[in-house]
Amino acid sequence: MRCVPVFIILLLLIPSASSAAVQPKTEKDDVPLASVHDSALRILSRQCCITIPECCRIG
């Protein structure tokens, strides 16, 4: 019966130990979603202008 409290304490410690090992995300890893979206539009626009000139954006 003495093992039951020890087992319960170990079960409670396991989730907290895994969260301590996770490193916080730094700001340099963050990529603004707007820049990703703009890059995708730029690439699609460039490919579209090569194949179909009518779909090019003005400006």
Swiss-Prot record:
Expressed by the venom duct. InterPro entries: T-conotoxin (IPR031565). The keyword Thylakoid does not apply. GO terms for molecular function: toxin activity. Residues 1-19 form the signal peptide. Residues 20-46 form a propeptide. The modification Isoleucine amide is found at I58. It holds the Pfam family Chi-conotoxin. Disulfide bonds join C48-C55, C49-C56. Keywords: Amidation, Disulfide bond, Pyrrolidone carboxylic acid, Secreted, Signal, Toxin. GO terms for cellular component: extracellular region. It is found in: Secreted. The modification Pyrrolidone carboxylic acid is found at Q47. Negative results: does not have the ability to interact with the G-protein coupled somatostatin type 3 receptor (SSTR3). The cysteine framework is V (CC-CC). Belongs to the conotoxin T superfamily. This is Conotoxin ViVA. It comes from Conus virgo. The lineage of its organism: Eukaryota, Metazoa, Spiralia, Lophotrochozoa, Mollusca.
